[in-house]
Structure formats: C-alpha cells, structure tokens
Amino acid sequence: MKKMKQWLLLLCLALGLTGCDSVGEILNEVIQSGVLDEYLWPEKVQKIEVPDGEMEVHFIDVGQADCALLASGGHFMLIDGGNNDDAEHIVTYLQNAGVKKLDLVVGTHPHEDHIGSLDAAIEAFDIGAVYMPDVSADTETYRDVLDAVEGKGLQVQHPVPGDVLDFNGLPVEIFGPVKEYSNLNNHSIVLRVSVGETAFLFTGDVEIEGEYDILEQGFDISADVLKVSHHGSSGSSVEEFLAYTDADYAVISVGEGNIYDHPEAVTLKRLQNYGMEIFRTDEQGTIVCDTDGKNISFRQERESKP
C-alpha cells in the first residue's frame, strides 16, 4: 500500500507540472510500465502457492455461469468452465495462477454455462483426468468438450455416487447424480472435497428432486463451504438439504443483473435462516477461500455494494 501511495503521489506531481493535455499520455505510460498491475488487476500477477494438506479455492467471476479452481501443493482441479465466451478469461486466469497441469477437470453437467470453455482449458493445459455425468447433450458446446478430451488422448470418465477421487491426497467424494433424470440440472455431479477438518460441497445446478435423492442415499454431505446450486435459483437449495450441509459459508456464482433474477430472495432467505455468511460473484467479483484444514478465510475482488 505504501508503494501504491508513492506512485499516486508521483502521478499527481507529474499531472500538475505538465497540465491537463498530457494526462492521457502519462496515464498510458504508467499503465504500460506495469508498476500498478498488482493494484489494478490482481489476477495479472496472481500465482497460487499452497502447501500440501491445505487448499485454496478460486470461485472465478464468470457472470451467469460457474467456474472454480482448486489448488493444493502445486496440484490443480477445475470444476466447470463458464460460458463459451469466457475462454480467454479463464485460460489467462489459470496461466497467471501458475497452472501447468489440471489434475482433475469436472464438468458438472453439459449445460453451456458450466462447460462452455472447458474445451479451451483442456486444450491449453496438460490434463490428468476429465469427469462428467453419464449423460449427453446435442449441442456444439458439448461436442467441443468431447473433441478436446479426445485430442488429449483421454476419455471422459463418469463417476457414480460412492466413488472417491483423489486430489493431491485430499478425498473428493461423489454424491450425485443418483439416477437418470429428464432435467439435465439434476444430472449434476455433486461432490465434496475434504481438507483436514474442513469440507467444501460443490453442487453444480442440482435441483430439489436431485437434492432429495442424495439425502435418501444417506451420504454425509456436511460442509463448511457450500457452492450454492443453480446460481441461487429457488428451484434448488431446499431447506432439508441446507440443514444437512450445516454450512457456515455459501458462495453463489451469478451474473449481475441477470434475466433470471438470481439469486432469488427466497433462496437468500433460506441460506440466512441457516446462519450462512453469503458471498456473491455479482457483488464481490472473484472470491477466494483458503483453508489450512482447520481455519477458513475469504477474500474477494471487491467489496459488496451497500
């Protein structure tokens, strides 16, 4: 912060000496020099370094879509990949975070706002394994992802409830989808990543029917951090499901001013009724959560609007 104040002081002095005609030139020179990068564009200089046994989760702001990057001990996992037009943003974010290889890639379900740029991420980095539900979609977006996976010499794997994947020694438990559904949202892969005494539950876009089916399986879905399903739609996050998660924090990935009115007031009320502190990408931008296995902390790109 001290360095920031020094640069602002120098900038003000320069503007005072040269007059208003040179404001644009001076600003451009300062910006191009890169000295303000870490203050103006945090993601440009962001590099993730997390010890083994700890984890950092980046809920990347991709508007009305989902994308989360998990990091632990130099290993990375990507859950969903935003919309089609998020490719450059996501790939650049991952590159600047120091990603060379994605050990696990999860497309929770084949809707464009969740797998839109997965093909770009798969093509840009070395890939360990790709997981998607055993359901297809007759869309170019879905076919692009399959082509990207094939281009890496891999096959999409279809996890089932009860499976436990490994992410740098951290268990990734699969809870859903439980069965076949007519609604693609309910085909969402629902998973929990545990780190020591803490846990993170990712729910894709699973809706109430799918949530009840998961509860009926008797899984322990308790978590400290809940990635709220379906951008905060009232058709998800039923009270019983929230009660069983017993989460302290809720993260909603949602676009500002979206046409669906997400997150809906009834969903926010449910989350508040269960005492969850709510973070929203439409208000706070990219949200980062850190855990050492005991403690959890949050930071965000910007402060919430009053």
Language-model features: locations:
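Non-globular, low-confidence helical/coil segments that flank catalytic cores
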Residues: 2-306
